[in-house]
Structure formats: C-alpha cells, structure tokens
From Swiss-Prot:
Belongs to the PC-esterase family. This is PC-esterase domain-containing protein 1B. It comes from Homo sapiens. Residues 264-293, 398-432 are annotated as: Disordered. It comes from the Eukaryota.
C-alpha cells in the first residue's frame, strides 16, 4: 500500500468538499483525515477518546456535542467541520442509517453553497442493537430507502463510498449499548455485523455505489481494538485513511506516486493484549498523476497552493524523472532513502508501515492488503507478481463493471470511469 503524505493528501483533496456520516468509529475517520490534511502524525489515544469537543485540530463543533447535553441516546447529535483555504470536511453523527434527521442532512447538502464531491458513510451498530425487536427488518428497509434517496439527491459528479462496518471484539462494552443490554447483545453482535455488512454492501452495489470492505481489511487486526471492543487505535485509523484515499484516487483517475510501499502495516500474529485507548467520479476531468515523491518530508510540499488572492488552481504534475533500467531477471527495489513521515506519542520510522497481499484489488493497480494482519516493523521486500490462479475475488467492490489493468503493477493514468447512476426523471431544481 502506498502511504500518502500530508502534502499529497492536500493535493488529492484540493478544492474538494468531503462529507463523512456515521457513528463514533467514523468520527475517528473524520479526525484522522482532518489531521492528515495538516500533519504527518497519528491520532493520540486522548484525541480518539474525546467526543463532542468544541475544537479539534483547527476544526469547529457546529452543532450538538458539548454545545448541548452529552448522552448516549438515539437523538444524540454532533456536527463538526474543518475548513481551510482549499478544503472542506464535514462530519455528521448518525444513530440510524435512514431517518428524518438524515433527510434533513441531505436537504442541507442539496441547498448548500457547495455540492459534496465525496461522501463517506456507514451506519450499522446502532441500527441493529438499539431499535427493538424489529431492528433487522427496519435496517433492511432503511438501507433501500437510503440508497434510493442518495441516488436522487447527490449529483452524478459526487463519489459515494459505503464502508462496511469494522469488526467488533468478542466482548462489546461500547457506550452505544445501555448497561442492561451489553451482556445480552455482545454475545451475537460480532456475527450480526457480518450479516449486516453483506446486506448493506449488496444494496449499495445494486444502486451503483462504491463499497469499501473495511471489515475484510481489518478482520485479523483485533489486537488493535480498544478495550471496549468497538474502537481502534491511531495506527489502524491511519491505515483506514490510506485505504479510503487510494480508493478515491482510483475512482477519480488520479495516479498515485510510484514508490515502494513503506513498512508492513498488518501481518498475522498470535493474539495479544488489546491496545488501550479510548466510480462515480467527475467524468469531465482527465486523469492527473500526483507529483513524484520527495526525498525527505522536510522539503517543500509537492504543490504549493496559491495565496488567497489568486484563483484556485487544479492539480499540477511536473515532468517525471527519467526511468531507471533494470535487468529483466532482477526484482525492482525502492529508489531513494526511506521516508520518516510520522511523529506521535510513539516514535517510529515509515518502514514500519507496509501492506502486502497475495490478493491484488482490481480497483487499485499496485495496491495490496494482506489477508493476515498485524502492526509491526518489517524489512523492505521486493515485488514479485502473484500467479493468476492464486488471486481470489477483489474486496473493493464497484456497482458496475470496471476496466482491469493487465497486471497488478500497471499504473492507472486513466480518465475517471463514467457513472452508471441514472439521473432522476424529474429532478428537483437546486435552491438558489
């Protein structure tokens, strides 16, 4: 997996409006993206535990949270927003996948000054555990209503990525479960999440929306769960952000930097103690490759953003350096020194992060995730193609057929794939 730096993430999301909807796990997804837009650092345990705070890394609490009454009820609200000169990221806390509140959010987005370019969404745990004996039937009906509504409200240029719910632990004590329900619900919640993911992913693909199977990617990473069995540590959330960004880059036809994967993120290991802590893209834009990598994170960014007085500029791509010839019988090794991109409460080098797989995802050329996970330092490894007979089905699903590259190491460099979402017969006029 290519690990993007903060400067590259700022370039990828330049002049983009990103909306994230979901529960407390997706609040951490929002926080990690906001942090990554500014710094090459990981979220601290304190930042992951905090909820409803007035400010986080230059963002603002717009509604709910500590501005109101903090509780774990079904009507809890929290709206956060991060805004810079060239980025807008907004988070809405959801306790149900489709509701009157969700319809209000969609109307707000539809009537806003800017239409969203990217929507990242999931809702599962609250839906299947907090709404009584008919929770399952309601969840299935709400999923169908949700994707029908999204197909009518979101513009065709907007990329919606439905994330499957992350795995949960053997024991679940998260705050979304009232104490009297924890013992009853925790015994079967783990399997119910798998079942819910199947139905939600099927419904999303049925309406031609993208699906990113986070449950698959992190199914062997439970040693990185918080003690409550629901939330995850900062390293997992950074890996999650990289998966999302790679998926988005592929859908938008953006070519990621050509450099060796940096460190092995996740690999199989014996169970250990839990870590404590709390392509529907815009079809009119050609594929633009990101700039080549920098030799050190202390150098200037890939693309200097224009000052506020100048108009916004699109992504630019300098001429790549001349290729280096390799002998046909030798594997290709990374060029240049390894990067040290991150700093946090834990000091480590970037070669601690590497995501390797025998299962290349068809949606991402040269993008891999190993099916056995762990966090730990590993030595750099050469690239060897995987025989075709060892390649099972991809785990990043699209709602429609995709162009497949000839091999797992072929860069995309293609135009964004056209959307098969049909525009509504009688679309409602956008409010002025």
């Amino acid at each position: 997996m290519i690990l993007l730096r903060a400067s590259e993430v700022r370039q990828l999301l330049h002049n983009k409006f990103v909306v994230i909807l979901g529960d407390s796990v997706h609040r951490a997804v929002y926080k990690d993206l906001v942090l990554l837009l500014q710094k090459d650092r990981l979220l601290t345990p304190g930042q992951l535990r905090a909820r409803g705070e007035l400010n986080f890394e230059q963002d603002e609490l717009v509604d709910g949270g500590q501005r109101g009454h903090m509780h774990n009820g079904l009507n809890y609200r929290e709206v956060r927003e991060f805004r810079s000169d060239h980025h807008l990221v907004r988070f809405y806390f959801l306790t149900r996948v489709y509701s009157d509140y969700l319809q209000t959010i969609l109307k707000e987005l539809q009537s806003g000054e800017h239409a969203p370019d990217l929507v990242i969404m999931n809702s599962c745990l609250w839906d299947i555990s907090r709404y009584g004996p008919n929770s399952w039937r309601s969840y299935l009906e709400n999923l169908e209503n949700l994707f029908q509504c999204l197909g009518q409200v979101l513009p065709e240029s907007c990329l919606l990525v439905w994330n499957t719910a992350m795995p949960v632990g053997e024991e679940v004590t998260g705050g979304f479960l009232p104490p009297k329900l924890r013992r009853q619900k925790a015994t079967f919640l783990k399997n119910e999440v798998v079942k819910a993911n199947f139905h939600s992913a099927t419904e999303a693909r049925k309406h031609n929306f993208d699906v990113l199977d986070l449950h698959f990617h992190f199914r062997h990473a439970r040693e990185n769960l918080h003690w409550d069995g629901v939330h995850w540590n900062g390293r997992v959330h950074r890996c999650l952000s990289q998966l999302l960004l790679a998926h988005v880059a592929d859908a938008w036809g953006v070519e990621l930097p050509h450099r060796h994967p940096v460190g092995e993120w996740i690999k199989k290991k014996k169970p250990g103690p839990r870590v404590e802590g709390p392509p529907q893209a815009n079809r009119n834009h050609p594929a633009l490759p990101l700039s080549p990598p920098l030799p050190s994170p202390t150098y200037r960014p890939l693309l200097g953003f224009p000052p506020q007085r100048l108009p916004l500029l699109p992504l630019l791509s300098p001429q790549p350096p001349p290729p280096i010839l390799h002998h046909q019988g030798m594997p290709r090794f990374p060029q240049g020194p390894p990067d040290a991109c991150f700093s946090s409460d834990h000091t480590f080098q970037s070669d601690q992060f590497y995501c390797h797989s025998d299962v290349p995802s068809s949606a991402h050329a040269g993008f891999f995730v190993e099916d056995n996970f762990m966090v730990g330092p590993q030595l750099p490894m050469p690239f060897f193609p995987t025989p075709r007979y060892q390649r099972p089905a991809p785990v990043v699903h699209r709602g429609f057929g995709r162009y497949r590259p000839r091999g797992p190491y072929t860069p995309w460099g293609q135009r964004p794939r056209p959307s098969k979402r049909r525009a509504p017969a009688n679309p409602e006029p956008r409010p002025q």
